[in-house]
């Protein structure tokens, strides 16, 4: 069984998370400029057996797609072209950034560190992926 990589896509920065090979626990992987994500994933996939990607689906409160969805669809097209052997799933990422920010606040991390968007991106990607894993395990 291979790992699953979670992707919290952003216009400027993208957070990445990964699972253990048994696909039970999600862990933070990286936060990168979005322009570097595909290159990073190509290198990562040479080192680690990745079987699927979960890309966050940013929905509005009323369930309609967020404005960034067009960019995400373009990115998914690139992801499919580069990793045709991997499955790509979408998962609702509503509130992951707010939960990540609250987690940072409650963890006692200093304000200066909480302002580091890369930490927030990684936590959001991890929350997205863990939520997906929990959903998937409840479906069995």
Residue ranges of each PLM-predicted region?
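Phosphate- and other anionic-substrate recognition elements at nucleic-acid/protein interfaces
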Residues: 2-4, 11-140
């Amino acid at each position: 069984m291979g790992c699953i990589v979670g992707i919290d896509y952003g216009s400027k920065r993208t957070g990445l998370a990964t699972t253990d090979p048994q696909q039970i626990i999600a862990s933070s992987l990286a936060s990168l400029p979005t322009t570097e994500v595909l290159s990073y994933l190509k290198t990562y996939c040479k080192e680690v057996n990745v079987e699927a990607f979960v890309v966050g689906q940013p929905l509005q409160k009323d369930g309609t797609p967020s404005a960034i969805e067009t960019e995400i669809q373009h990115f998914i097209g690139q992801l499919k072209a580069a990793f045709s052997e991997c499955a790509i799933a979408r998962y609702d990422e509503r509130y992951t950034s707010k939960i990540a920010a609250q987690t940072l606040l409650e963890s006692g991390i200093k304000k200066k560190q909480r302002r580091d968007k890369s930490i927030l991106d990684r936590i959001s990607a991890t929350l997205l992926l863990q939520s997906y894993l929990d959903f998937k395990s409840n479906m069995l």
